[in-house]
Amino acid sequence: MGVTIHFHGALDDPARLDAALAMLREECERRGWPYRSLDFEACGPHEMYTFHQVPGPLLDWTDVITETGMTELDTRWRGLSIEPHPDCESLLMMFDEHDARLMLLTTVGDTNSVSYCMSVKTQFAPPEIHVAICEVLHRLQDEFGHEKLIVYDESGYFQTQDMAALLKMRDDIEAAMDDLETITRVVQLGAIGDEVEPPDEDALYERRN
Protein backbone atom coordinates (compact mmCIF):
# COMPACT_ATOMS: atom_id res chain seq x y z
CA MET A 1 0.00 0.00 0.00
CA GLY A 2 1.29 3.45 -0.89
CA VAL A 3 1.41 6.02 -3.67
CA THR A 4 3.04 4.35 -6.66
CA ILE A 5 4.03 5.38 -10.19
CA HIS A 6 3.63 2.67 -12.85
CA PHE A 7 5.30 2.76 -16.26
CA HIS A 8 5.64 0.41 -19.21
CA GLY A 9 6.21 0.36 -22.95
CA ALA A 10 9.32 1.15 -24.96
CA LEU A 11 11.43 3.86 -26.51
CA ASP A 12 10.13 4.95 -29.89
CA ASP A 13 13.49 4.14 -31.54
CA PRO A 14 15.57 1.26 -30.08
CA ALA A 15 18.67 2.76 -31.68
CA ARG A 16 18.42 5.64 -29.18
CA LEU A 17 18.73 3.45 -26.08
CA ASP A 18 22.28 4.64 -25.35
CA ALA A 19 21.17 8.27 -25.66
CA ALA A 20 18.25 7.66 -23.29
CA LEU A 21 20.54 6.04 -20.71
CA ALA A 22 22.96 8.96 -21.00
CA MET A 23 20.08 11.35 -20.31
CA LEU A 24 19.05 9.33 -17.25
CA ARG A 25 22.63 9.37 -15.92
CA GLU A 26 22.70 13.14 -16.43
CA GLU A 27 19.46 13.52 -14.45
CA CYS A 28 20.82 11.37 -11.61
CA GLU A 29 24.04 13.37 -11.39
CA ARG A 30 22.18 16.69 -11.50
CA ARG A 31 19.80 15.61 -8.72
CA GLY A 32 22.43 13.86 -6.59
CA TRP A 33 20.80 10.43 -6.94
CA PRO A 34 23.12 7.42 -6.57
CA TYR A 35 22.80 4.93 -9.42
CA ARG A 36 24.36 1.78 -10.86
CA SER A 37 24.69 0.91 -14.53
CA LEU A 38 23.60 -2.69 -15.18
CA ASP A 39 24.11 -4.96 -18.20
CA PHE A 40 23.15 -8.64 -18.03
CA GLU A 41 22.57 -11.48 -20.46
CA ALA A 42 18.90 -12.50 -20.52
CA CYS A 43 18.51 -15.89 -22.16
CA GLY A 44 16.44 -19.04 -21.79
CA PRO A 45 12.95 -19.76 -20.48
CA HIS A 46 11.40 -17.18 -18.16
CA GLU A 47 8.10 -17.12 -16.35
CA MET A 48 6.28 -14.04 -17.63
CA TYR A 49 4.04 -11.90 -15.43
CA THR A 50 1.27 -9.80 -16.95
CA PHE A 51 -0.63 -7.30 -14.80
CA HIS A 52 -4.18 -6.02 -15.28
CA GLN A 53 -5.83 -3.21 -13.35
CA VAL A 54 -9.27 -3.79 -11.84
CA PRO A 55 -11.49 -1.55 -9.68
CA GLY A 56 -10.25 -1.35 -6.09
CA PRO A 57 -12.11 -1.37 -2.76
CA LEU A 58 -12.21 2.44 -2.49
CA LEU A 59 -13.58 5.05 -4.87
CA ASP A 60 -11.08 6.00 -7.61
CA TRP A 61 -8.62 3.33 -6.45
CA THR A 62 -7.51 0.29 -8.44
CA ASP A 63 -6.19 -3.18 -7.67
CA VAL A 64 -3.96 -5.29 -9.88
CA ILE A 65 -4.41 -8.94 -10.84
CA THR A 66 -1.53 -11.03 -12.17
CA GLU A 67 -1.45 -13.62 -14.95
CA THR A 68 1.53 -15.89 -15.66
CA GLY A 69 2.92 -17.75 -18.68
CA MET A 70 6.28 -18.81 -20.14
CA THR A 71 8.46 -17.03 -22.68
CA GLU A 72 11.92 -17.58 -24.20
CA LEU A 73 14.44 -14.72 -24.00
CA ASP A 74 17.59 -14.14 -26.03
CA THR A 75 18.70 -10.57 -25.37
CA ARG A 76 20.55 -8.32 -22.95
CA TRP A 77 19.04 -6.44 -20.00
CA ARG A 78 20.50 -2.95 -19.80
CA GLY A 79 19.85 0.20 -17.84
CA LEU A 80 20.14 1.89 -14.47
CA SER A 81 19.17 1.12 -10.88
CA ILE A 82 18.52 4.54 -9.33
CA GLU A 83 18.13 5.48 -5.64
CA PRO A 84 16.14 8.75 -5.51
CA HIS A 85 15.83 8.67 -1.68
CA PRO A 86 16.53 6.20 1.17
CA ASP A 87 12.79 5.96 1.89
CA CYS A 88 11.79 5.47 -1.75
CA GLU A 89 11.86 2.24 -3.71
CA SER A 90 14.65 1.89 -6.26
CA LEU A 91 13.76 3.36 -9.64
CA LEU A 92 14.68 0.66 -12.15
CA MET A 93 15.09 2.01 -15.67
CA MET A 94 15.96 -1.29 -17.33
CA PHE A 95 15.40 -2.19 -20.98
CA ASP A 96 15.46 -5.13 -23.37
CA GLU A 97 18.41 -4.19 -25.58
CA HIS A 98 16.76 -5.52 -28.76
CA ASP A 99 13.59 -3.44 -28.76
CA ALA A 100 14.26 -0.90 -25.94
CA ARG A 101 11.22 -2.18 -24.07
CA LEU A 102 11.10 -1.62 -20.32
CA MET A 103 11.76 -4.99 -18.69
CA LEU A 104 12.14 -6.33 -15.15
CA LEU A 105 13.99 -9.60 -14.49
CA THR A 106 13.89 -11.44 -11.17
CA THR A 107 15.13 -14.81 -9.92
CA VAL A 108 13.55 -16.72 -7.04
CA GLY A 109 15.18 -20.07 -6.35
CA ASP A 110 15.60 -21.79 -9.71
CA THR A 111 12.89 -19.75 -11.45
CA ASN A 112 13.73 -16.81 -13.69
CA SER A 113 10.90 -14.35 -14.25
CA VAL A 114 10.25 -11.40 -16.54
CA SER A 115 7.72 -8.58 -16.40
CA TYR A 116 7.22 -5.65 -18.73
CA CYS A 117 5.46 -3.48 -16.14
CA MET A 118 7.64 -1.31 -13.90
CA SER A 119 6.72 0.65 -10.79
CA VAL A 120 8.21 2.75 -8.00
CA LYS A 121 6.53 3.41 -4.64
CA THR A 122 7.17 6.89 -3.24
CA GLN A 123 4.76 6.89 -0.26
CA PHE A 124 7.42 7.06 2.47
CA ALA A 125 9.77 9.53 0.79
CA PRO A 126 9.19 13.31 0.76
CA PRO A 127 6.59 14.36 -1.83
CA GLU A 128 9.31 16.29 -3.66
CA ILE A 129 10.85 12.93 -4.59
CA HIS A 130 7.58 11.87 -6.24
CA VAL A 131 7.58 15.15 -8.17
CA ALA A 132 11.21 14.70 -9.24
CA ILE A 133 10.63 11.15 -10.49
CA CYS A 134 7.66 12.41 -12.51
CA GLU A 135 9.90 15.09 -14.03
CA VAL A 136 12.46 12.49 -15.09
CA LEU A 137 9.78 10.22 -16.57
CA HIS A 138 8.24 13.18 -18.40
CA ARG A 139 11.61 13.99 -19.95
CA LEU A 140 12.15 10.35 -20.96
CA GLN A 141 8.68 10.22 -22.49
CA ASP A 142 8.98 13.58 -24.27
CA GLU A 143 12.44 12.97 -25.73
CA PHE A 144 12.48 9.22 -26.34
CA GLY A 145 9.06 7.60 -25.84
CA HIS A 146 6.34 9.98 -26.98
CA GLU A 147 4.53 7.20 -28.87
CA LYS A 148 5.28 4.03 -26.90
CA LEU A 149 6.12 4.90 -23.27
CA ILE A 150 3.13 4.88 -20.89
CA VAL A 151 3.17 6.32 -17.36
CA TYR A 152 0.34 5.96 -14.83
CA ASP A 153 0.64 7.85 -11.55
CA GLU A 154 -1.86 6.67 -8.91
CA SER A 155 -1.98 10.17 -7.44
CA GLY A 156 -2.58 11.77 -10.82
CA TYR A 157 0.37 14.14 -10.37
CA PHE A 158 2.19 12.96 -13.51
CA GLN A 159 -0.87 13.79 -15.58
CA THR A 160 -2.03 17.00 -13.87
CA GLN A 161 0.84 18.40 -11.73
CA ASP A 162 -1.80 18.78 -8.99
CA MET A 163 0.27 18.86 -5.79
CA ALA A 164 -2.80 19.10 -3.57
CA ALA A 165 -4.17 15.83 -4.97
CA LEU A 166 -0.81 14.11 -4.42
CA LEU A 167 -0.61 15.27 -0.81
CA LYS A 168 -4.22 14.28 -0.12
CA MET A 169 -3.69 10.76 -1.44
CA ARG A 170 -0.53 10.35 0.64
CA ASP A 171 -2.41 11.54 3.75
CA ASP A 172 -5.39 9.27 3.05
CA ILE A 173 -3.13 6.23 2.68
CA GLU A 174 -1.15 7.11 5.80
CA ALA A 175 -4.39 7.43 7.78
CA ALA A 176 -5.63 4.11 6.43
CA MET A 177 -2.37 2.42 7.44
CA ASP A 178 -2.59 3.97 10.92
CA ASP A 179 -6.17 2.71 11.26
CA LEU A 180 -5.12 -0.78 10.15
CA GLU A 181 -2.25 -0.79 12.64
CA THR A 182 -4.61 0.22 15.46
CA ILE A 183 -7.18 -2.43 14.58
CA THR A 184 -4.48 -5.11 14.20
CA ARG A 185 -3.07 -4.28 17.63
CA VAL A 186 -6.54 -4.49 19.19
CA VAL A 187 -7.07 -7.93 17.66
CA GLN A 188 -3.64 -9.15 18.78
CA LEU A 189 -4.09 -7.93 22.36
CA GLY A 190 -7.58 -9.37 22.50
CA ALA A 191 -6.25 -12.72 21.34
CA ILE A 192 -3.94 -12.96 24.36
CA GLY A 193 -6.66 -12.04 26.80
CA ASP A 194 -5.79 -8.41 27.58
CA GLU A 195 -8.58 -5.94 28.09
CA VAL A 196 -8.31 -3.14 25.55
CA GLU A 197 -10.32 -0.11 24.65
CA PRO A 198 -11.94 -0.29 21.20
CA PRO A 199 -10.75 2.33 18.70
CA ASP A 200 -12.55 5.68 18.89
CA GLU A 201 -14.73 5.68 15.79
CA ASP A 202 -15.15 9.47 15.84
CA ALA A 203 -11.39 9.98 15.99
CA LEU A 204 -10.83 7.55 13.12
CA TYR A 205 -13.47 9.33 11.05
CA GLU A 206 -11.86 12.72 11.68
CA ARG A 207 -8.43 11.38 10.71
CA ARG A 208 -9.76 10.06 7.40
CA ASN A 209 -11.53 13.32 6.64
Residue map of PLM features:
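Acidic (Asp/Glu-rich) sequence patches and key acidic residues
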Residues: 1-209
